[in-house]
């Protein structure tokens, strides 16, 4: 379980500003806090009668999703529209990609149409980095999820949710529960929590759904729900990603729910003001009980709302960083 992006900060320009948003690995705490603060300021836009600001007017954002998505794709579309960008969403199932066109050829054709930014979701880990290295450097690349590797905007919207409900990270205990092995969300959340100073990060899963080397993320590993949930402030549930599983990692979904499903009884072991989160889609009766998903501890729908603001922040900051980099290069070329 080695991070793909521990070398040079490809995501940043020469001034240390966001240029692409590929992963949370290697990003400093100050930058993550800036993203959260910027998103906080954008939450007010969603309450307006006219939900628009002109920050990306005249810019074109292309959403290119090679995997199915509802929340991520829709919230990226809304985020770009609220920033006044022109938005194109490529339906990969009806595009030339379904006829054998390569990922790079698809994006280069879109690039030739003068797109300013690509939001890409792909099933291969490292796809976003590959695109950022090979597409025109003036085009910002935002990772909407790549394989098992990373889902940085989901990680940041989860951090915004925690901060708005808990005030900060320095004294929190956070448990991430479920299919850790196949979850890009788990990786992004572990990185973000560690960077933002959370002192107690726990992962709870059966041994077959824990990746090798997970200890490098500075987490405590539990294989018992009762023990792992004791006195936690935040529970982040993850779905079973059957589409990524090979072999008999689990006896059955029913057995998983019996041992690792979040029920009202199990949640009673957490702190009384604990919040429950889930990136979606929810599988009720598999990883979470309906009474918990719809109950007073749940902030799952808040996550969706905060997701729009986080994606507005990332889109605007990456576009600003690209513009600053071009100005820097022009000045130094004179």
Curated annotation (Swiss-Prot):
Disulfide bonds: none annotated. Pathway: Pyrimidine metabolism; UMP biosynthesis via de novo pathway; (S)-dihydroorotate from bicarbonate: step 2/3. This is Aspartate carbamoyltransferase catalytic subunit. The lineage of its organism: Bacteria, Pseudomonadati, Pseudomonadota, Gammaproteobacteria, Pseudomonadales. Belongs to the aspartate/ornithine carbamoyltransferase superfamily. ATCase family. One of its GO terms (biological process) is 'de novo' UMP biosynthetic process. Carbamoyl phosphate binds at residues 71-72, 121, 151, 154, 280-281. One of its GO terms (cellular component) is cytosol. Catalyzes the condensation of carbamoyl phosphate and aspartate to form carbamoyl aspartate and inorganic phosphate, the committed step in the de novo pyrimidine nucleotide biosynthesis pathway. One of its GO terms (molecular function) is aspartate carbamoyltransferase activity. It comes from Pseudomonas fluorescens (strain Pf0-1). It catalyses: carbamoyl phosphate + L-aspartate = N-carbamoyl-L-aspartate + phosphate + H(+). Keywords: Pyrimidine biosynthesis, Transferase. L-aspartate binds at residues 99, 184, 239. Its EC number is 2.1.3.2. Pfam families: OTCace, OTCace_N. Heterododecamer (2C3:3R2) of six catalytic PyrB chains organized as two trimers (C3), and six regulatory PyrI chains organized as three dimers (R2). It comes from the Bacteria.
């Amino acid at each position: 379980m080695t991070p793909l992006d521990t070398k040079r900060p490809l995501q940043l320009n020469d001034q240390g500003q966001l240029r692409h948003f590929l992963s949370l690995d290697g990003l400093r705490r100050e930058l993550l806090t800036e993203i959260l603060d910027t998103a906080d300021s954008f939450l007010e836009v969603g309450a307006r009668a006219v939900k628009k600001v002109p920050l990306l007017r005249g810019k074109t954002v292309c959403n290119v999703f090679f995997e199915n998505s509802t929340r991520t794709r829709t919230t990226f579309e809304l985020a770009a529209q609220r920033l006044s960008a022109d938005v194109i969403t490529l339906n990969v199932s009806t595009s030339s990609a379904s006829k054998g066109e390569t990922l790079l050829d698809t994006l280069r054709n879109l690039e030739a149409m003068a797109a300013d930014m690509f939001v890409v979701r792909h099933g291969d880990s490292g796809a976003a980095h590959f695109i950022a290295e090979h597409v025109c450097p003036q085009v910002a690349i935002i990772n909407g999820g790549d394989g098992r590797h990373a889902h940085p905007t989901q990680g940041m919207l989860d951090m915004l949710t925690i901060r708005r409900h808990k005030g900060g990270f320095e004294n929190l205990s956070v448990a991430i529960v479920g299919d850790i092995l196949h979850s890009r969300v788990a990786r992004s959340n572990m990185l973000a929590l560690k960077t933002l100073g959370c002192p107690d990060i726990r992962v709870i899963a059966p041994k077959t759904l824990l990746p090798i080397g997970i200890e490098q993320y500075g987490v405590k590993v539990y294989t018992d729900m009762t023990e792992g949930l004791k006195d936690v402030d935040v529970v982040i549930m993850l779905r079973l990603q059957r589409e990524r599983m090979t072999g008999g990692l689990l006896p059955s979904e029913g057995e998983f729910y019996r041992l690792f499903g979040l029920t009202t009884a199990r949640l009673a072991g957490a702190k009384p003001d604990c919040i429950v989160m889930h990136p979606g889609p929810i599988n009720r009766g598999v990883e979470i009980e309906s009474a918990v998903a719809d109950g007073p501890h749940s902030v799952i729908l808040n996550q969706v709302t905060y997701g729009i603001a986080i994606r507005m922040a990332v889109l605007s900051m990456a576009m600003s960083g690209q513009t600053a980099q071009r100005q820097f290069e022009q000045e130094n070329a004179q």
